[in-house]
Design a protein with these regions (language model features):
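Mitochondrial intermembrane space
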Residues: 14-147
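N-terminal Sec-pathway targeting helices
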Residues: 1-11
């Protein structure tokens, strides 16, 4: 009986330590949206100190979009410890083959109808500033530079 109690106690302590280890790591809020009119958006936000803060950042960012764009589909919204591919390139400021809205704390890649994507990118950057962002700019494909 004592051995069973010791084993249970060790499992509980191990579970608590594992939870705090995961909860206290830093995470990047990333998400992908697709719209009915052919646009795809990949968003990367600045690193958050905890998983809860990361999830809250994704929710704060996506809630107004989902409210205004009923035809938009959230492909994913997750918290990543490490980035790769397009998301890593956005974070690092590497040139990418799509338009990107750059604002403090946010990089948003846009792909869509070629005849309209530039105008939409510039409009989105202007809307972010109107909405309270300190600055935002549309960066054209292949022209991003590392900070």
């Amino acid at each position: 009986m004592k051995q069973a109690l010791v084993i249970v106690a060790l499992l509980v302590v191990g579970s608590v330590l594992a939870y705090y280890h995961v909860a206290n790591q830093s995470y990047f809020p990333v998400s992908k949206l697709a719209s009915a009119d052919g646009y795809t958006f990949h968003m990367v936000q600045d690193r958050r100190a905890q998983r809860n803060a990361c999830a809250e950042a994704n929710n704060r960012f996506l809630a107004p979009i989902k409210a205004r764009c009923l035809q938009c589909d959230v492909v994913y919204a997750r918290c990543e410890r490490e980035l790769q591919g397009l998301e890593l390139a956005l974070l690092m400021g590497d040139p990418v083959p799509v338009h990107v809205v750059v604002s403090p704390g946010l990089r948003l890649a846009m792909d869509g109808p070629k005849e309209r994507v530039r105008r939409e990118c510039e409009q989105l950057a202007a809307d972010l500033v109107k909405g309270g962002a300190p600055s935002a700019a549309c960066v054209f494909p292949g022209t991003m530079r590392r900070p």
